[in-house]
Amino acid sequence: MSLFDHKISELKELLHKKELSVSDLVDESYKRINEVDGKVQAFLALDEEKARAYAKELDEAVGEKDELGLLFGMPIGVKDNIVTKDLRTTASSKILQNFDPIYDATVVNRLRDAEVVTIGKLNMDEFAMGSSTENSGYKATKNPWNLNTVPGGSSGGSAASVAAGEVPFSLGSDTGGSIRQPASFCGVVGLKPTYGRVSRYGLIAFASSLDQIGPITRNVEDNAYVLQAIAGVDQMDATSANVDVPDFLSSLTGDIKGMKIAVPKEYLGEGVGEEAKESVLQALKVLEGLGATWEEVSLPHSKYALATYYLLSSSEASANLARFDGIRYGYRTDNAENLIDLYKNTRSEGFGNEVKRRIMLGTFALSSGYYDAYYKKAQKVRTLIKKDFEDVFEKYDVIVGPTTPTPAFKIGEKTSDPLTMYANDILTIPVNLAGVPGISVPCGFANGLPLGLQIIGKHFDEGTVYRVAHAFEQATDHHKAKPEL
């Protein structure tokens, strides 16, 4: 049994009793990375020397402290688009291949306050644009359940590292499903918080109105622990919400009697695989057995979500990625005779194909003559999608459905057709457009590959999302399954 099979609360208890040391946990993490990361390819950079030194420092402090930090001594992996001071951060792009940040993201600072140990940086799709981690500028991460399949994306390294037992939890970011989809593919728990719940300061931006940082863990309780540590308003991020942070752990009661669950017919319709549908129907039976009731509802504008998302996110990416020009930081071409050539060649050599595709799409959508027809119309549809969710939440506590239409697909299977790749996020994208919280928890298997149940809540009501997810988890054994590597 791995140390990381224990919950965070159990590990903290062992540390407090001095039956376990932080150095033991860090040793376990690097030992496992050495054993399996050659196959899984989750990590891009390791911070071993500093991690071991900090672990020793924390061990020495155990006897001197009355109270340990919320996540005291826990090893963590951080997605490579979250800046870490003096630890290379590339967003998995060649254009940032030698970028060493001079500051820490707010979430990294808050985790340091909670006394975690950063193990290293995790692979992802370049600039978080992708659903399979095949768009990384460095390597493709593999799914620990089947090394011939993708781990999902864009937080593929974050999900794979937790599923493979390399770290007990990780941070990811979610713009259109990039935490929940890989969590589903890898059989772990991933939460996209409400937009504004967690500071984005220090997150390398893809689409600023959609991006949100969140935790990936092995169980729901651990997920609540991590969100507790990173949530809250931040003066460095004007989009972070000045909303009280409740005690998320107090929501994990196991009691969902009388709760009303909505199941969108669009989430069990065309394009959703039979295995995903069946796993959700079985999950609903479990939730009924726990005292909840469910009814079918409609989110009528969700059919426009995919097109709306790609217009808006690509438009925002076009603006956000304009800063990577070869002048201020990152890669600079050697092949330029003038300033215009420098810009063009740096960007064409530094960005991968998917990033270029989305920059071009976004630039087109924002261009004169097309702005009203595309970008402005997409903003109006986004408002309608948000209204659909608000209407449902007037009568229901949560919305439930599959996280993804299918289990993980084979590496290389969808790279030649971007549209089939994009369609993989069709069930997660509406949540980002509406800005509401959503979690994926393991709910079954298809052909030996995990499936995820998506539970969606009202704005700033992660507590109820956690309550339902935890009750389901406690009534099933799906989260206990581990891949064999």
Swiss-Prot record:
Keywords: ATP-binding, Ligase, Nucleotide-binding, Protein biosynthesis. It comes from the Bacteria. Belongs to the amidase family. GatA subfamily. InterPro entries: Amidase, Amidase_CS, Amidase_dom, AS_sf, GatA. It comes from Bacillus pumilus (strain SAFR-032). The keyword Ligase applies. The active site is at K79, S154, S178. It is an enzyme of class 6 (ligase). Its EC number is 6.3.5.7. GO terms for biological process: translation. GO terms for cellular component: glutamyl-tRNA(Gln) amidotransferase complex. Gene3D superfamilies: Amidase signature (AS) domain. The keyword Protein biosynthesis applies. Pfam families: Amidase (PF01425). Heterotrimer of A, B and C subunits. SUPFAM superfamilies: Amidase signature (AS) enzymes. Allows the formation of correctly charged Gln-tRNA(Gln) through the transamidation of misacylated Glu-tRNA(Gln) in organisms which lack glutaminyl-tRNA synthetase. The reaction takes place in the presence of glutamine and ATP through an activated gamma-phospho-Glu-tRNA(Gln). It catalyses: L-glutamyl-tRNA(Gln) + L-glutamine + ATP + H2O = L-glutaminyl-tRNA(Gln) + L-glutamate + ADP + phosphate + H(+). One of its GO terms (molecular function) is ATP binding. This is Glutamyl-tRNA(Gln) amidotransferase subunit A.
